[in-house]
């Protein structure tokens, strides 16, 4: 929650200086990802103006962050027997809490084109950065895929995962068509199926 509060303060500072309108790219991890997901949810999944952030988003999120617990929300998901399979994949429980208790119901593909948002996490298999964006998911080692109907809440939960707290997010990688470029700086057209 500390990271979320910190990022809420940073966005407030930017809004007070009329700077939210100048942002073209945002890269987040952990609490920053969770907070930005809630900002988008509060604005109908569009980027807020500085005035909109100060008058609507900031007060709403300040109140919600003081009244709700993401950790207890994730634990409450175990009251549903269908979620028992996630006992060891607690990030999946966090994703369910974001959907059911915080209302984060959009898919990655529903995010706006601007600002370009990179939601970052780490793969358990390689330890490399795994990135979620509006139009792609993946990393340079495993490859990239179109997100399809991938839930924003799942991407946020994966970004917030950490050992001992919320473990890795479990999802079916076989549901995606992965592509990889032969080299980091190769043209996108050179990507081949993995």
Predicted regions and their residues:
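Surface-exposed acidic, glycine-flexible loop patches that form ligand/cofactor-binding
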Residues: 17-20, 102-112
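Conserved loop->alpha-helix
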Residues: 95-98
């Amino acid at each position: 929650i500390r990271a979320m509060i910190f990022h809420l303060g940073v966005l407030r500072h930017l809004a007070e200086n009329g700077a939210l309108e100048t942002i073209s790219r945002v890269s987040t991890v952990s609490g920053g990802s969770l907070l930005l997901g809630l900002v988008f949810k509060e604005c109908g999944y569009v980027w807020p103006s500085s005035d909109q952030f100060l008058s609507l988003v900031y007060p709403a999120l300040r109140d919600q962050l003081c009244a709700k617990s993401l950790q207890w929300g994730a634990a409450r998901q175990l009251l549903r027997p269908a979620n028992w399979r996630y006992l060891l994949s607690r990030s999946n429980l966090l994703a369910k809490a974001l959907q059911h208790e915080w209302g984060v119901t959009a898919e990655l593909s529903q995010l706006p084109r601007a600002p370009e948002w990179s939601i970052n996490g780490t793969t358990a298999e390689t330890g490399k950065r795994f990135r979620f964006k509006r139009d792609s998911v993946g990393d340079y080692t495993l490859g990239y895929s179109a997100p399809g109907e991938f839930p924003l809440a799942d991407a946020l939960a994966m970004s917030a995962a950490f050992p001992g707290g919320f473990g890795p997010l479990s999802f079916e990688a076989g549901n995606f068509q992965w592509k990889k470029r032969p080299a980091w700086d190769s043209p996108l057209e050179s990507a081949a199926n993995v």
